[in-house]
Design a protein with these regions (language model features):
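Short acidic/polar active-site loop segments enriched in Thr and Asp
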Residues: 104-105, 205, 224
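Polyanion-binding loop/helix "lid" in catalytic or ligand-binding cores
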Residues: 147-158, 186, 196, 252-264
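Active-site/ligand-binding-proximal alpha/beta "capping" segment
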Residues: 163, 168-205, 263
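Zn-dependent metallopeptidase/amidohydrolase metal-coordination segment
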Residues: 209-247
Length: 270
């Protein structure tokens, strides 16, 4: 993996991706933050050596380098998932690349279903902790100790100082921002009523199919990490309604302006 990482980093440096401070992963229906940045360079994932290729049709599949609120940022416009047939090492490969390029902070967004019935669709949830239900770990491979501590500490996977800033920004801008536990499952099928009941018993407030692998690797690399979910549907097992993926995307897009406000104002403080 080290050789692949070096090849990818050399390619991106040659394209002008120089010393980004912050990495941002944009999830389902949340790609419009790129309209807020001054783009310096952008490259399709298809053209980046050793990079996975986005197969989800509503993910743009671009790596973008630019300036936002006075900071150099690198943005993944679309991410990878284990349900696309990728390994967890593939899914998290871009995080390792962004770290080698220079980022110190990783910000992540996603669309998720609300298990906590006090949370409503269209609202946002700051992730305070998570449940890794992906069936494995992105650190479970030979040679991982060459890239960082094998037994990565996960006592505080989400940076407390950044989360406190997010909460203060939300309050100042009258944005409802819940805080809770995110469960990451494989997908791509949505959950059954029994699975939602199980997740609630386990302590999950929301469920999705991403984010946790990237956060694990961010911690492995010593990055500060934070993540926010857009709650796109309500997962009440006693009144479960069929959900269409187009509805999820539409709800994420509706909540996107508040997400953009939070990210922009946070980045200004970093």
């Amino acid at each position: 993996m080290i050789k692949f990482i070096e090849e990818t980093v050399d390619y991106l440096k040659g394209k002008g991706f120089e010393s980004p401070e912050i990495g941002i992963i944009l999830g389902t229906g949340l790609g419009q933050l790129v309209n807020e940045i001054t783009i310096i360079k952008e490259v399709s994932y298809n053209h980046i050596p050793n990079f996975p290729t986005a197969t989800v049709e509503f993910h743009k599949g671009k790596l973008i380098y630019g300036e936002l609120e006075g900071k150099k940022v690198i943005i993944m416009q679309g991410r990878f998932h284990i349900y696309e047939g990728y390994s967890l090492q593939d899914v998290t490969y871009p995080v390792r690349i962004m770290e080698k390029l220079g980022i110190k902070t990783l910000l992540v967004s996603n669309a998720s279903g609300a298990i906590n019935l006090d949370y409503k669709k269209g609202e946002l949830m700051l992730i305070d902790d998570h449940l890794n239900l992906q069936g494995s770990s992105p650190l479970a491979f030979k040679g991982v100790e060459l890239l960082g501590e094998r037994f990565a500490d996960m006592s505080l996977p989400y940076d407390v100082a950044i989360n406190n800033k997010f909460k203060a920004i939300a309050k100042a801008n009258n944005i409802k921002l819940h805080e809770g536990v995110y469960a990451s499952v494989v997908g791509p099928q949505l959950e059954t009523r029994a699975e939602y009941r199980m997740l609630k018993i386990l302590g999950a407030d929301a469920v999705g199919m991403s984010t946790v692998p990237e956060i694990i690797v961010a911690n492995h690399l010593g990055l500060k990490a934070a993540a926010i979910s857009v709650l796109t549907d309500e997962c009440d097992p006693n009144n479960l309604q069929p959900v269409d993926i187009s509805e999820i995307i539409a709800m994420a897009a509706k909540a996107e302006p508040e997400m953009i406000t939070l990210f922009k104002k946070l980045i200004k403080t970093l």
